[in-house]
Design a protein with these regions (language model features):
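N-terminal exported-region signature
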Residues: 3-130
Length: 130
């Protein structure tokens, strides 16, 4: 890994000895010099017990569930506060325009979203369906 950063710009620069902690539910971006696999060791989170605090402005979040889910349904409880959701491929969900071309939220992927107000995202358990 050459560099990665979290939602607030804190950087992980291993060649310079700069380290950060990953925060539960938060996403991060990584710039690498070649194809890489990131292995994260820890306890698997129960999505229904892990609310994600969303700040006003831009956020990067992790998708914590084990199965893909419809983006519109995942964000239905907070959609009035969501301006845009973006995946890593450039697909978007604009709630105000009733437009979504993100196929689904997928385990292991992160998402950027812009909030018009702070809110809390609460995922359903892995036993429930959207």
């Amino acid at each position: 890994c050459i560099r990665d950063r979290n939602n607030v710009g804190a950087a992980f620069l291993p060649t310079w000895g700069i380290d950060i902690d990953l925060e539960i539910g938060q996403g991060f971006q990584a710039k690498v010099s070649s194809n890489s696999v990131v292995e994260i060791i820890g306890t698997q989170l129960m999505p229904e017990l892990t609310p994600i605090e969303l700040d006003l402005g831009w956020n990067m979040i992790a998708y914590l569930r084990e199965e893909p889910a419809d983006v519109v349904l995942v964000f239905q409880e907070v959609e009035e506060s969501v301006t845009i959701v973006k995946d890593g491929l450039g697909n978007v969900y604009f709630p105000d325009w009733n437009f979504c071309n993100i196929p689904a939220m997928v385990p292991g992927e992160g998402y950027q979203l812009k909030m018009s107000a702070a809110d809390t995202l609460e995922y359903l358990s892995n036993d429930e369906e959207y």
